[in-house]
Design a protein with these regions (language model features):
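OB-fold and OB-like single-stranded nucleic-acid-recognition modules
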Residues: 1-401
């Protein structure tokens, strides 16, 4: 009898999930909550829900930060040390007491990336003043006093994924905020590593001219679907769960050959599971959807010909608002310079065969309650399978998936 192959443990190797926003700060009465008392415990916290107006193209993008302490004491701050050359030593992780978070004797030994960095003030010489904090609580308190509505800023942070009522949600957690430089244009960019399988490329949405791309995002959970992922406390932090998240890839309908090659090169997976890191943009509520000349109805084109509108005026009048939609649009694969000092080469961050399909079929993904015996739950949507195998469709777009 053949020995059952062990599953490969999921891990975040060469994994990135970060964002950058450049635009105007939108500060309202509800942006900050200061020294709020939790209803469930003795926890005191500060919370920031900040919108950044990244312009008509991207809209107002939300990001957040929250942190606090226990009234009864015992709050610890996790940090890491420095190496002799001053670089971060991630292998040297430890905690300091809450009351020591401003103690210079401790701060001088802590690695740079343990700090949140804020630079939204200038000195008398017009130089940016950088303030560093160990806790989100102190960051939010400082921003509450100093961040002003309309201030042009650059925000960097990490993407965090969670599950609420069976829906995957994304949070943009702030790491740093600086004044944007004069030459920096609006930006709403993210970089996200994901896992792709043969079902990831779905049937194109021909109204929006996009391919839905479903990737798996790895996030660590202590409990998932009623299952204890710490194995009774033996596994600190829990285990990684592959969360299904839908992205979009825009295509040019006028160049079918280019679209076909682009999908084949980057997204198509023939076997096993591929890991890829993509750069993309957020488009959220308030973004303006720009109309092109080809999109204009004939009656409006006639008004242009008769001189009632210029082409520019007509395009502006026909632009529509994106409403409450929240989109993550994939643009291009990430390129990273790898190798030693004498042999550095650019490398597309795409790794085929990272896992087998079976590696993602984990027992703890199934809800703990007994499933209905009359209904078998598949690891993918039945519609997805039909799309992948539907190669006889008349449309060239449909032939790509």
């Amino acid at each position: 009898m053949a020995r059952k192959k062990d599953k490969k443990a999921l891990e975040k190797k060469n994994w990135v999930q970060k964002f950058t926003l450049i635009g105007n700060a939108v500060v309202k009465d509800y942006t900050f909550k200061i020294d709020e008392h939790s209803n469930k415990s003795d926890w005191i916290y500060n919370l920031m829900n900040l919108s950044v107006d990244c312009g008509d193209r991207y809209g107002k993008i939300g990001c957040e930060l929250m942190g606090g302490y226990s009234l009864n004491g015992g709050t610890s701050i996790y940090v890491h040390g420095k190496k002799e050359d001053g670089s971060d030593d991630f292998s040297n992780q430890y905690t300091i007491d809450w009351d020591d978070r401003f103690n210079e004797d401790y701060l001088s030994d802590i690695g740079r990336s343990s700090f949140y960095r804020i630079g939204i003030e200038k000195d008398t010489n017009d130089n940016v003043v950088v303030n560093s904090f160990l806790t989100p609580y102190d960051v939010v308190a400082y921003l509450h006093e100093n961040l002003k509505d309309g201030m042009r800023i650059k925000v960097n942070g990490q993407l965090r994924y969670s599950v609420y009522q069976d829906t995957v949600q994304i949070r943009k957690e702030v790491n740093s905020i600086f004044l944007a430089k004069d030459n920096e244009e609006n930006k709403s960019e993210f970089t996200q590593t994901m896992l792709l399988d043969k079902y990831s490329v779905e049937k194109p949405d021909k109204e929006k001219n996009v391919f839905p791309i479903t990737g798996y995002i790895l996030e660590k959970f202590k409990e998932y679907n009623g299952n204890d992922l710490t194995e009774g406390g033996k596994i600190k932090g829990g285990k990684f769960v592959p969360l299904r998240k839908r992205f979009e890839y825009e295509y040019d309908v006028t160049d079918p050959e280019k679209v076909k090659k682009a999908i084949e090169k980057v997204f198509k997976v023939k076997k096993d599971v591929t890991q890829i890191t993509m750069v993309g943009v957020f488009v959220e509520g308030g973004a303006t959807v720009q109309t092109t000349e080809d999109d204009l109805p004939d009656d409006i084109k006639e008004l242009i010909e008769l001189g009632y509108y210029t082409l520019e005026q007509a395009l502006d009048a026909c632009a529509t608002n994106g409403g409450k939609e929240k989109r993550m649009i994939l643009r291009r694969p990430m390129i990273k310079i790898v190798g030693d000092e004498d042999n550095k080469v650019p490398q597309i961050q795409k790794f085929e065969g990272m896992y087998s399909d079976d590696d993602l079929m984990l027992d703890y993904l199934i809800k703990k309650e007994e499933p209905d015996e009359d209904e078998e739950e598949l690891p993918f949507d039945e519609d997805d399978e039909e799309v992948v195998e539907d190669v006889n469709d008349d449309s060239w777009l449909d032939k790509l998936v």
